[in-house]
């Protein structure tokens, strides 16, 4: 069992149940999945860029990413229907908690000029998304071997009913929110 998963079951559930005034343990919000999305628009011209992005995302997440393809042709972006334009990976269970642990304790503190995560990035339904400008903040990525510095979006999907419950859950895990 991952360290944060054990921490959630032993401490976070009890704390949130009393803090949020919930009667049933099953009402306590939980983290359902983490989705990491990397848009690679430059891959339209060079397929090697997509291969490198997939390799980097696999190293970061510990799981093979799915290549996302464009749904329709857009002349302004010079893309055609079905072309590879990004990659994503969905983490659940053990791998999700291990990634979360590395993200909070190792990667986010390595970010340049990091002042905390924006507390307004909740979607209204208990999910939280933030962007990472440089994927080299993850210790799995060797700066010397990367061809380019890429950004990515990380989405935390929770079972929380609203933003307040989701924020309480993420703060209990130790998310460094601003303010």
UniProtKB/Swiss-Prot annotation:
HAMAP family found in the cross-reference section: Ribosomal_uL5_B
NCBIfam families with a match to the protein in the record:
PRK00010.1 (NF000585)
Q: Which GO terms describe its molecular function?
A: rRNA binding; structural constituent of ribosome; tRNA binding
| Name used for this protein in its record | Large ribosomal subunit protein uL5
State if Metal-binding is listed as a keyword: no
Function of the protein:
This is one of the proteins that bind and probably mediate the attachment of the 5S RNA into the large ribosomal subunit, where it forms part of the central protuberance. In the 70S ribosome it contacts protein S13 of the 30S subunit (bridge B1b), connecting the 2 subunits; this bridge is implicated in subunit movement. Contacts the P site tRNA; the 5S rRNA and some of its associated proteins might help stabilize positioning of ribosome-bound tRNAs.
Task: Kindly list the cysteine pairs connected by disulfide bridges.
Answer: none
- Coiled-coil ranges (or none): none
Which UniProt keywords are listed?
Ribonucleoprotein, Ribosomal protein, RNA-binding, rRNA-binding, tRNA-binding
User: Where does this protein come from, organism-wise?
Assistant: Dichelobacter nodosus (strain VCS1703A)
Quaternary state and interactors: Part of the 50S ribosomal subunit; part of the 5S rRNA/L5/L18/L25 subcomplex. Contacts the 5S rRNA and the P site tRNA. Forms a bridge to the 30S subunit in the 70S ribosome.
List the gene name. Answer: rplE
Q: Which domain of life is it from?
A: Bacteria
Q: Show the Pfam families listed in the entry.
A: Ribosomal_L5 (PF00281), Ribosomal_L5_C (PF00673)
Of the GO CC terms on this record, one is:
ribosome
For the keyword Membrane, the answer is no
Any single GO BP term = translation
The record's similarity note reads: Belongs to the universal ribosomal protein uL5 family.
